[in-house]
Amino acid sequence: MRPPFFNIIIHKDDTFPDLHGVCAGFESRQWRKDQLVDYLFEYLPEFALTYSEFEKLTGENVVAKIRQITASIYQSEKFENRGEFGELLLHAIIRETYNTLPAISKIYYKDGPNETVKGFDAVHVVVTDDTLELWLGEVKFYNNIYKAISDVIEELNLHVEVRYVRNEFVAITNKIDAQWPHADRLMTLLHPHTSLDDVFSKTCIPVLLTYDSSVLTKYDKKCDEYIQEISEEFTKIHKNFCDKLGVFPLTIHLFLFPLNTKIELMNSLESKLKIWQRL
């Protein structure tokens, strides 16, 4: 059995929203930047391909598909700001921590009129025998945590407006792969005839915020002092987020992910992307 990659330093589920303080960990006296990049790229085919394309991956076509994926990312309008990288990180975290299933391929989120789902950085589901829970993700891949909080709360408030939500549900429904095993259940949930009250009762928003952490840069291994200090940092940020959010109609799972520096992680991700493009 494959062990989890991410270290959950702190998990507080007795507050709203709940808190997950997540860390990539350390190895050989260094923050596990390179290991994180390798792990994220394990998810890249699943993140970028439709369900049907992913299911058809074979030893014969996988290299061609990887080239297709990397070309799609480079052509994305989000690439200049590395938005795709934050979305990939969110994808990996919620897949690992909550065993979510991706419902939509992010690379197929077009920016043209009538087919935009800019509002959601991830569209996943959690499936049980009786229910299908919709996970609509938001991520701010930032170096400044307080700027991240300010920007994400502005978007969260926009994304629960009725007209906005209905438009986004239409865009999502149009991109659900008919071969995906849960397609019918999700389309029924998002149908205009389904009350938004019922939809919202089965919907949560995972929010991922990254930031350059002064605590993280002080340590080169996981120790009691690091756990205590980073936990205090997580708790302080969580309180700031909660105070600014106020009352909110949907369940939120807040994921905080400290970085040594955002720029060095972005450079490593881009280098890996270029290597994959040359395969």
Identify the residue ranges that each predicted region occupies:
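Acidic, metal/cofactor-coordinating or nucleic-acid-engaging core segments within structured domains
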Residues: 150-228
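Active-site ExK catalytic segment of metal-dependent nucleases
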Residues: 133-159
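A short, glycine/Asx- and small/polar-enriched loop/turn
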Residues: 115-119
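Extended, charged low-complexity segments
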Residues: 221-279
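A short, highly charged nucleic-acid-interacting micro-segment common to nuclease
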Residues: 70-89
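Conserved catalytic cores of phosphodiester-cleaving nucleases, focusing on short active-site segments
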Residues: 94, 121-124, 134-141
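A structured, charge-rich N-terminal accessory region that forms the first stable segment of a protein
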Residues: 1-66
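A short acidic/basic microdomain associated with nuclease active sites
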Residues: 98-114
